[in-house]
């Protein structure tokens, strides 16, 4: 994943900062890796309720990941306050898991863990598909499981 930076001196990859050729290369790189991507897509997401929508999506993601026997979710770190909010959301979601199920969340800076860029690439490809640019989505369609989340925001 690190090679996707190219010759640019950037700390981490951002889908919205890539040109179409770079986006395609990123999706092709991702398609060549082992893995399966669960994507929680919340709607509606009003600008003033983004954190609430994120929490609803994160809660659903915990339930889905646990069903695949995932025990650790690594999220890209944000601020200490927002990271703590994520942790509280995961703690709350664990009450809906079967008794004795292990599940935890950790935060890592995006610049330190290139595998976190996969989430940005998948989200970008899915958003592009919803905007009518289906090529990116088609490259990874067999690797993605989309979960629609009603955010009630």
What residue ranges belong to the model's regions?
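Phosphate-ester processing/binding pockets and catalytic centers
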Residues: 1-153
């Amino acid at each position: 994943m690190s090679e996707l930076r190219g010759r640019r001196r950037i700390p981490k990859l951002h889908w919205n900062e890539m040109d179409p050729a770079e986006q395609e290369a990123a999706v092709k790189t991702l398609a060549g890796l082992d893995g399966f991507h669960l994507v929680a897509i919340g709607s509606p997401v009003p600008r003033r309720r983004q954190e609430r929508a994120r929490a609803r999506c994160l809660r659903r993601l915990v339930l889905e990941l646990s069903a695949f026997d995932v025990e650790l979710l690594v999220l890209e770190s944000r601020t200490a306050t927002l990271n703590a909010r994520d942790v509280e959301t995961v703690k709350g979601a664990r009450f809906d898991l079967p008794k004795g199920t292990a599940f935890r969340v950790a935060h890592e800076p995006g610049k330190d863990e290139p595998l976190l860029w996969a989430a940005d690439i998948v989200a970008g490809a899915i958003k592009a598909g919803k905007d009518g640019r289906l090529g990116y989505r088609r490259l990874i369609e067999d690797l993605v499981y989309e979960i629609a989340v009603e955010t009630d925001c």
